[in-house]
Amino acid sequence: EDTGTFEEGHGGVR
């Protein structure tokens, strides 16, 4: 599940 972007530090997996 994408919970944001990696750059924001939320660990977004897309």
From Swiss-Prot:
Cellular component GO terms held in the UniProt record: extracellular region
Post-translational modification note: Conversion of fibrinogen to fibrin is triggered by thrombin, which cleaves fibrinopeptides A and B from alpha and beta chains, and thus exposes the N-terminal polymerization sites responsible for the formation of the soft clot. The soft clot is converted into the hard clot by factor XIIIA which catalyzes the epsilon-(gamma-glutamyl)lysine cross-linking between gamma chains (stronger) and between alpha chains (weaker) of different monomers. Forms F13A-mediated cross-links between a glutamine and the epsilon-amino group of a lysine residue, forming fibronectin-fibrinogen heteropolymers.
Residue stretches spanning the membrane: none
GO biological process: blood coagulation
Chief location category: secreted
Subcellular locations according to the entry: Secreted
UniProt entry keywords in alphabetical sequence: Blood coagulation, Coiled coil, Disulfide bond, Hemostasis, Secreted
Entry note about domains: A long coiled coil structure formed by 3 polypeptide chains connects the central nodule to the C-terminal domains (distal nodules). The long C-terminal ends of the alpha chains fold back, contributing a fourth strand to the coiled coil structure.
Biological function: Cleaved by the protease thrombin to yield monomers which, together with fibrinogen beta (FGB) and fibrinogen gamma (FGG), polymerize to form an insoluble fibrin matrix. Fibrin has a major function in hemostasis as one of the primary components of blood clots.
Protein name in the entry: Fibrinogen alpha chain
Organism: Tiliqua rugosa (Shingleback lizard)
